[in-house]
């Protein structure tokens, strides 16, 4: 459901687009905020336009002085998804070419060998309960196994909510992932058993948390910095 007030000629189409995403079982919170800004942009800059044409799309493409590369790319990708939806329902729309979106510096990944992976998970399993982080020893082994076994990105797992983890069917619903796309990830039986046991234990500690991996106080997810620090600590255990 679109929670922001809309005023442009695209208002009904935006609402329908969000309803479509919601009908698939995925919230669209961050994208809704971007769509709301797009609606304001259209109402102020192109009040007479009722179609997502090239002129409007390229105007939206322009990078702002205070905008970083990731933020610029995110708002472009949301409107690409919107244009794709419009085309699917029979409405003409200009899709910004993917080649025109911002790209960050190229990153060369390190491929871990078997010994490094074994050492990493030995470290992950070696954490002990801590008075200021009573569930850290439960979270870390499952969090990084989910990344390793299912290919989730750190932010996707970190922000994962309980409602998006199906421990019956063995599925994780990833919402608002890279490119503002949603997907369903299957969980293997051995990892599923681990996640079920973890869920039972973590719910006893943080029964009211919405997050599958709640932070030390149970009031939200862990930070990006925390996941990076714990990653390197796993190698030093």
Place the predicted regions along the sequence by residue.
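Conserved catalytic core of the tyrosine transesterase superfamily
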Residues: 1-237
